[in-house]
Amino acid sequence: MFFAARVAAPFVFELFCRQDWRAWTRPELLFIDRDLVCLFLRHRHIMRSAHANDARARRDRKDSKDRKGLVFVPSVPFVLSVLSVLSVLSLLLLSSTIMKYSSIKRFLLLATIVLIVTPALPAWAGGNDKLANIPRSEYSARRQKLLAQIKDGIVVMVGAREEDFGEVGRFRQRNDFMYLTGVQTPAAYLIFVPAGVIPGKPQHETVFIPPRNPGHEQWTGFQIGPGAEGEQFFGLQEVAPSTAFKERLSELLARPAAEGKPPTKIYTVMPSWKGGEISRESRFVEMLQQSHPKNPIVDVSGIIAPLRLIKSQSEIEMLQKAVDVSIEGHREIMAAIKPGAYEYEAQAALEAPWTRLGSERPGYPSIVGSGINGTILHYNENRKRIEAGELVVVDAAAEYSYYTADITRTYPASGKFTPRQREVYQLVLEAQRAAEKAFVPGKSSLLDLQRAAKKVMENSPLRDKKGNTLDKSFIHGLGHWIGMDVHDVGSYMSLPVGSVFTIEPGIYLPDEGFGVRIEDDYLVTDKGLVKMSAKMPSEAAEIERMMLSQRPAPPQR
């Protein structure tokens, strides 16, 4: 009845409040509450999936002595069926009301549209044919490229859990898992079997996700379940319950041994060292080693990294969106950086537009370092008071649909650079431009660009307090890849077409109490570099103009 009331509301308003008796002829009213239509269609889809899961459960019970865990399974489709009947009755009531003021032709047209649109539920439920703004077909193509390079093993991976982000942290899927599947469900696994690796087994892709749990969803939100529901939503061959993962893996690995063939290799993501933290990958690899000691374990990261390095058009669009959103934050922070303000206040002004523009989170901890803190490369405490005459290094960018930008600017707290600050800033900017000009499509590496930037600093007459050329104060690499990670994966031997990287020269002078860094994002094309962050000013004069223009004018005497 709630559904019927919500759908009927616009028509009732037109009919009785505006006395528009031809309201039914206005098609825009059909779309006044599209989200509600999506909810209704999703409800019908869930009902079908519940019936399918119920049928599977009944089959399983025939071979099970303990039926306690299945007592409530039949009640799910029953409840959903009752809800469906109520929905149909509500629609019939609505239809009879509409028929009083409309023709049979228009009513039949509406009924036909509903019948045609309803089977297309998975696309409507997900909003479109994409997962996290990447087409489902692209995820499939990525899997095909991966499996085409593996001839002697199967791919086995584990996804992230909710517990990995603390008790109430926001879930984020692991990058490689997300890259291959688009599945954002916590506690997932995958098994990809290339053709010919397992005797009698064609190429097959299975993702394992937890069965739906209404009680859990009450706390964390709607989750897609295994079976037909998940297969349609994610565009995968098979989506099975996570409880079946270990048994399925053992079954697959046992087949070659039963036929006297060498043990199948297990390709998985090997654990990375993170400050001594025991990651889920570590425990997962340990489990594989203990459960299948005869099967060699191979790191699949070396195969996935080159795939992730070359960005598709969809990925480039997400990176550009992340860049554009990040720039809005940098524009906002210029008004917040002033003597007497705190670094965290400036950070708040920086990050607020990101959320407003659809960013899920910062791409990395925001660096807002004033004065001496600007000489600390990964400073992120952001607690110091900003003093007059200081420079503030802001290295911060947003993530958008799993892709992150990386932008750095250096701002004068008083609105204008001192002569010394300005000459150092200009040298850093010249070094960045020299690196840009040094790029030759198909030939240059990041090291070539770094040499060009350092040469500018080395040839400059500027010196530090000890008399050294300022290239000695450029203490880090010139740049890095960006993508799903701020320091994304891939070899730096070349700069291939389709890759995206940063150019970020910097000079750090602790003895003088300031540092300068300028960082922008670049897309490699066959014609040269495209500066994705070109909308963000970097000229000293333009930075000063923008900062001063956002400050209140002094009172007139």
Q: What is each stretch, according to the model?
A:
Residues 1-112, 117-119:
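Intrinsic disorder/low-complexity segments
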Residues 56, 65-67, 99-108, 123-557:
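Active-site neighborhoods and metal-handling regions in enzymes and metal-associated proteins
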